[in-house]
């Protein structure tokens, strides 16, 4: 992001000619005369015009709105239409920007609209380099995108109403119906999106015992969430509320898009739809049949795994 300039300068008189001011005489129609200063002037410092000043002012306006939590995000395909025109599609432009470590003008809550079948999905920037240098496999420059509203169709967290893992795979999320559902949605993404997204690496909670169903998670391990995923409870709320401490946290951090405001935690059932209850990947502490959710009013809660709720569309693009 640009650092706002503080060295703007006005036109000044050439120092060598400062003592030799020159004026031109102009005869006016009413018989009077006017005198124009024709002394040579030069620019000292950078030549900053309206284009550059307006660009910097956008950064200033963003900083004010972001601090006040009033920023609504911009459609990047409109804001950067001229720049994007040099690429095959907006997502290739994003990928190229990341490869060049150039995120100038990109902000949390800015979005790019896509269609998944007939469904309009507005993909918002949830965080920029939120996990850079993190994880067992070091993460480089990246942007994580989370849809402004949920995908219109609902899904059960797990059809068997069970939040435990298995002997072969102790991670509850890996066996979940919701993960399989998201994997199926990948084919509905535009081809240009599928071409640039990467799997998200995550320190995922484990919950399994051969002696019987567990009510709490007992460990964690690094796993690939897939190319489409949903956030954990900590990534939304910045703390563990219903998930098991500390295993439900992993190495998570709250996404900037969810910080200090309910605004982006509240999602519609489809673009602009009514408030939706939506699934998180975390399973609930103290129960063997509940998973964590974001309630329609933005609060943290938990629902039975066999309930059918909504999910946002989430993906990562790396450098």
Regions flagged by a language model, labelled:
Residues 1-65:
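Extracellular "spike/adhesin" assembly and maturation modules
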Residues 69-319:
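Collagenous Gly-X-Y triple-helix signature in extracellular proteins
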């Amino acid at each position: 992001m640009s650092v706002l300039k503080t060295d703007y300068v006005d036109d000044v008189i050439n120092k060598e000619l400062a003592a030799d001011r020159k004026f031109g005489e102009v005869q006016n129609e009413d018989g009077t005369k006017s005198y124009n200063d024709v002394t040579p002037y030069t620019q000292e410092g950078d030549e900053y015009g309206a284009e550059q000043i307006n660009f910097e002012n956008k950064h200033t306006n963003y900083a004010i709105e972001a601090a006040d939590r009033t920023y609504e995000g911009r459609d990047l395909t409109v804001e950067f239409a001229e720049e994007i025109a040099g690429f095959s599609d907006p997502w290739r432009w994003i990928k190229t920007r990341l490869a060049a470590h150039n995120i100038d003008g990109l902000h949390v809550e800015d979005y790019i609209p896509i269609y998944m079948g007939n469904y309009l999905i507005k993909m918002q920037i949830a965080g920029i380099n939120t996990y850079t240098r993190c994880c067992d496999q070091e993460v480089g420059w990246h942007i994580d995108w989370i849809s402004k509203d949920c995908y219109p169709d609902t899904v059960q967290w797990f059809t068997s109403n069970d939040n435990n893992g298995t002997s072969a795979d102790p991670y509850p999320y890996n066996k979940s119906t919701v993960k399989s559902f998201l994997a199926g949605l990948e084919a509905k993404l535009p081809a240009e999106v599928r071409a640039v997204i990467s799997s998200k690496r995550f320190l995922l909670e484990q919950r399994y015992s051969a002696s019987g169903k567990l009510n709490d998670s007992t460990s964690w391990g690094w796993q690939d969430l897939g190319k489409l995923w949903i956030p954990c409870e900590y990534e939304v709320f910045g703390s563990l509320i219903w998930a098991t401490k500390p295993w439900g946290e992993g190495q998570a951090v709250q996404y900037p898009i969810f910080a200090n405001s309910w605004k982006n935690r509240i999602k519609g059932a489809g673009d602009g739809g009514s408030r939706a209850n939506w699934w998180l990947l975390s399973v609930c502490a103290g129960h063997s049949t509940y998973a964590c959710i974001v309630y329609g009013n933005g609060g943290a809660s938990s629902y039975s795994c066999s309930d059918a709720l909504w999910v946002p569309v989430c993906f990562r693009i790396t450098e």
